[in-house]
Amino acid sequence: LTADLRYILGIPHTKLAIIHRQYFSLAKDLQFAYRLDYQTTLGSNKVPYFAQPELITSFLIAASNQGLGGKSSVRGILRNRVVGDAVGFGNFEFRYKFLRFEWLKQNFYLGTNVFFDSGLVLKPIEMDLSAVSATDRATYFSNYESGKFHSAAGIGLKIGWNENFVISADYGKAFNKQD
């Protein structure tokens, strides 16, 4: 028998996620892949500050599934940089396998990808900023209102082993230095 600590502490909340992924083969060894993700908090209960950045993902990836930004949501944006009661994001990438070879009777490939990722807050978290100076408000909070996109683009390298084990490294650069 297990129970979520949030319910034991009396701070329940519900989050809803709608995730769509699709892959297209454009030519031999060239694919286009995209993911669209919408997440929102349901009900009247407020989400505690420590649980606010949690994102629901297609795969259980522990601490790295927090907030927009980082390898699991918007690559090139600092992890946990963009948080809201409702968020949306998309990942769009072209993948190309440029070298296939056999080694030790195993099939390998090297590939690259170019990507564009973008996310936005659809419903901001209500915060009391009365104690925050106007300068700090302009520096730290001005770009995080509802409807402002946080975007990045980049490139990656993939090493595939027998088509089902892939090591991937991506480097993304945010369009806004504040991200």
Question: Where do the language-model regions lie?
Answer:
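Residue-level detector of the transmembrane beta-barrel scaffold of outer-membrane proteins
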Residues: T2, Q31-R35, N91, G111-F115, ...
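Outer-membrane beta-barrel transmembrane domain signature
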Residues: D29, K97, G111-A153
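C-terminal outer-membrane beta-barrel translocator/porin domains of Gram-negative envelope proteins
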Residues: L1-Q106, L122-P124, T139
